[in-house]
């Protein structure tokens, strides 16, 4: 075969998948029908969970240098700031990156693309997928090359990361269920001064919709995203000057617009693929789900799709696991996409409804509710975990098993394991647990008890074992995360808990690996 995996689409999702496969020794062929990486972008927000993954890829530091950290989000109504979500304060103990990083899709693609080239894989641009045929063993893909010729390549698996107009999805006959919104958005890169909170996200609510101001690199540089007023929706020759007056009025506060370097209008859809897999074909990112920009979730969700699938594909390609492991991709990620679509659709509908009652609620009631909610610790934590995507869980997955005896308040199977700062040797300095984990392998954490002296038979290089001894510093940190002692956690390569229990039993780990992960273990 020409490749183990054909990755169609070299946007953030495809590049993330290709990087993760390359790290695990999987041969990926990456194609994209466009001439090169995107130069302009609507996607901006990089969430905490994505930054945690970037750290494992080795690109988080350049991302932080390129981006702008937004440690809070502010709600404005009629020129008054009515509520604030303090992301940095809420998430300080939940993630190494308790903020929203404002970094354009183009910059994300450049970082991921450079990392992929450093791993020896180049994107084949101007190469279009025009045909697919699969049998029990492989795919045959017909590709249209830059000179117009058609060629054929073979691969064991195909990943459709080719966006909302996905050729992979269409050629596989998978329905894309949903509809477009009637509203027309605009986006503008502007130089502006005013009363907005610097270095934070500013949300302006008005009777017919909302405007968002994202802080960008450079003095007084902002990205403005908004909804066109009804009377401008059918105009095709709009310039930013055409919307300035309405923006000033709708924001309800003094704004001094100095320069606009880019302006564009667009419509958005809310759609989800009927399924994320067709035998040897998978859908990821915008090819699988698209939704409103509420919450800056779209690009991040695609990146997590890729992170979820990559380790599973690598195990199957290497022969380390049976193909049944791949069933868990759709079972885990489709509910996430549907839940996100439902949540963002409801929020978006509330924010843009033309109904006078909805407008009244938006400008008079919502702000008061938000202000009260942000005074409650439980709501603040829920908001951070939801927005940052650190709260995504797979409790119903076939890969999730919590053994009897583990108290209900402790992290459970399917959860992202908490970020902790721990000592792994007596009297040693505390370490960032996430930096110690090996995300190309499974990680077994033995807490307040010794790990098996001879490891776990049959898992070998697939497993890294970490002992967390009981001492005053560790006890405080574990108690904060509600992790009991003794306990143990088997973490999947993507950082989610696969198996959790109290007293570590190597036989239980072996059984889990064989029966749930479908790993080929000698003697089982």
Residue ranges and their predicted role:
Residues 66, 237-301, 321, 326, ...:
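FAD/FMN-dependent oxidoreductases across multiple families
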Residues 3, 147-157:
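Core beta-strand elements of the Rossmann-like FAD/NAD(P) dinucleotide-binding domain
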Residues 39-117, 216:
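Active-site-adjacent segment of FAD-dependent monooxygenases/related oxidoreductases
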Residues 14-15:
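N-terminal Rossmann-fold NAD(P) dinucleotide-binding loop
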Residues 125-139:
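A conserved short coil-to-beta-strand element within the FAD-binding core of flavoproteins
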Residues 1-4, 8, 24, 33, ...:
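Helical substrate-recognition/capping region of FAD-dependent monooxygenase/halogenase enzymes
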Residues 114, 157, 161-268:
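Conserved FAD-binding catalytic core of PHBH/FMO-like flavoproteins
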Residues 22-43:
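Glycine-rich FAD pyrophosphate-binding loop
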């Amino acid at each position: 075969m020409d490749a183990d995996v054909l990755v169609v689409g070299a946007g953030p999702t495809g590049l993330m998948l290709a990087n993760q496969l390359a790290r695990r020794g999987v041969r990926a062929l990456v194609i994209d029908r466009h001439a090169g990486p995107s130069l302009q972008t609507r996607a901006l927000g990089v969430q905490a969970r994505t930054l945690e993954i970037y750290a494992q890829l080795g690109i988080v530091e350049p991302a932080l240098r390129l981006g702008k950290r937004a440690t809070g989000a502010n709600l404005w109504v009629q020129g008054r700031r009515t509520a604030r979500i303090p992301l940095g304060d809420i998430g300080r103990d939940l993630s190494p990156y308790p903020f929203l990083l404002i970094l354009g899709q183009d910059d994300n693609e450049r970082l991921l693309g450079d990392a992929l080239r450093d791993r020896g894989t180049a994107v084949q641009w101007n190469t279009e997928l025009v045909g697919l045929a699969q049998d029990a063993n492989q795919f045959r893909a017909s590709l249209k090359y830059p000179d117009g010729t058609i060629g054929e390549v073979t691969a064991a698996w195909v990943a459709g990361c080719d966006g909302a107009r996905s050729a992979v999805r269409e050629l596989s006959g998978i329905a894309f269920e949903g509809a477009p919104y009637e509203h027309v958005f605009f986006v503008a890169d502007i130089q502006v001064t005013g009363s907005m909170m610097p270095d934070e996200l500013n949300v302006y609510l008005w009777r017919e919709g909302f405007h968002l101001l994202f802080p960008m690199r450079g003095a007084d540089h902002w990205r403005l995203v908004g909804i066109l007023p009804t009377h401008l929706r059918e105009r095709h020759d709009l310039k930013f000057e055409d919307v300035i007056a309405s923006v000033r009025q709708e924001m309800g506060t003094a704004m001094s617009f100095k320069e606009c370097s880019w302006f564009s209008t667009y419509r958005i859809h809310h759609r989800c693929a009927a399924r994320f897999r067709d035998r040897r074909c998978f859908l990821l990112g915008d090819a699988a789900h698209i939704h409103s920009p509420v919450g800056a979730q779209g690009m991040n969700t695609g990146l997590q799709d890729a992170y979820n699938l990559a380790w599973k594909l690598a195990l199957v390609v290497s022969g380390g696991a049976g193909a049944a492991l791949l069933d868990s991709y759709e079972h885990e990620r489709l509910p996430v996409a549907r839940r996100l679509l439902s949540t963002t659709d409801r929020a978006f509908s509330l924010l843009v409804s033309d109904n006078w009652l909805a407008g009244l609620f938006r400008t008079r009631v919502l702000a008061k509710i938000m202000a009260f909610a942000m005074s409650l610790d439980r709501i603040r934590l829920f908001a951070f975990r939801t927005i940052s995507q650190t709260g995504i869980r797979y409790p119903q997955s076939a890969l999730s098993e919590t053994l009897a005896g583990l108290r209900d308040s402790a992290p459970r199977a399917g959860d992202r394991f908490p970020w902790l700062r721990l000592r792994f040797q007596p009297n040693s300095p505390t370490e960032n647990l996430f930096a110690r984990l090996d995300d190309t392998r499974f990680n077994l954490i033995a807490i307040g008890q010794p790990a098996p002296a001879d490891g776990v038979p049959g898992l070998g290089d697939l497993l890294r074992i970490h002992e967390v001894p009981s001492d005053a510093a560790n006890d405080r940190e574990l108690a904060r995360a509600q992790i009991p002692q003794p306990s143990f956690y088997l973490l999947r390569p993507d950082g989610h808990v696969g198996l959790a229990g109290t007293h570590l039993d190597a036989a239980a780990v072996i059984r889990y690996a064989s029966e749930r992960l479908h790993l080929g273990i000698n003697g089982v």
